[in-house]
Regions:
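Sequence signature of WD/YWTD-type beta-propeller architectures
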Residues: 1-230
């Protein structure tokens, strides 16, 4: 799988969110007096069988007080044969679909960025990273979002029964294809632990030899990156 160029990421993830775009957008609008909207589209991640492409659209609402700004996102799954689109949204605490107009209870200052990171080897499941944080705080952690084609089911998972402040999604488990690998730790501490988590949230210590794996091809197109202002 082709990896994107190295980019800034709050958790030093191997699958960085477009944090440099978030920071650059804030720098471009230092004196806003009313909310502004900006948009970004991720590269597409094409399944190994070439049938599907997954990509995310990100909306940033910039407020005069940057700590009240919001970043929200949604994942699109496109059938490349039929052109049909399916929307995938995480069920994590800050997740919200910014492209569906409705009253939102999501608090101000939230950051929720979903990006596709890996297909399964057979192309029947996709793994996405849901990065969540709060502007102006040290709160930051990952969730895994797994879409399963056979059941058309979406699962949002993170390590459970484990004490940590930050979790970083690493990819599929190389030893157990139905599980994903996370690395967890506490802010300011060097010690890290690795965990294998299934779609039910069951969490076990990862085998030392278990290495993360990813499948799929990242494809850039003319729509990738910052988009026209909405």
């Amino acid at each position: 799988m082709t990896q994107p160029p190295t980019r800034l990421d709050p958790l030093n993830s191997p699958f960085p969110v477009p944090w440099n775009w978030v920071m650059a957008t804030l720098d471009e609008c230092p004196t806003v007096t009313s909310p502004l909207l900006r948009y970004y589209r991720s590269p597409s991640l094409v399944s190994p069988d070439g049938q599907y492409a997954a990509y995310s659209r990100i909306q940033m609402r910039i407020q005069p007080d940057f700590t009240r700004s919001q970043v929200a996102s949604v994942l699109f799954l496109e059938n490349l044969r039929t052109g049909a689109l399916q929307v995938i949204t995480a069920s994590s605490p800050f997740a919200d679909n910014p492209f569906v107009p409705r009253p939102s209870a999501t608090p101000l200052g939230t950051i929720a960025i979903i990006i596709p990171i890996a297909w399964s080897e057979q192309g029947d499941r996709i793994l996405s990273r849901e990065f969540e944080s709060l502007f102006g705080t040290a709160v930051a952690s990952d969730y895994a979002v797994v879409w399963e084609q056979r059941r058309n089911q979406t699962y949002t998972i993170a390590p459970t029964q484990v004490d940590y402040s930050n979790a970083v999604l690493l990819g599929w488990s190389g030893s157990y294809p139905d599980q994903v690998l996370f690395q967890t730790g506490h802010l300011g501490e060097e010690e890290r632990s690795r965990w294998a988590v299934d779609v039910a949230g069951r969490t076990i210590a990862a085998d030392p030899e278990d290495q993360p794996v990813v499948f799929g091809e990242l494809v850039n197109n003319i729509w990738t990156g910052p988009q026209a202002h909405g």
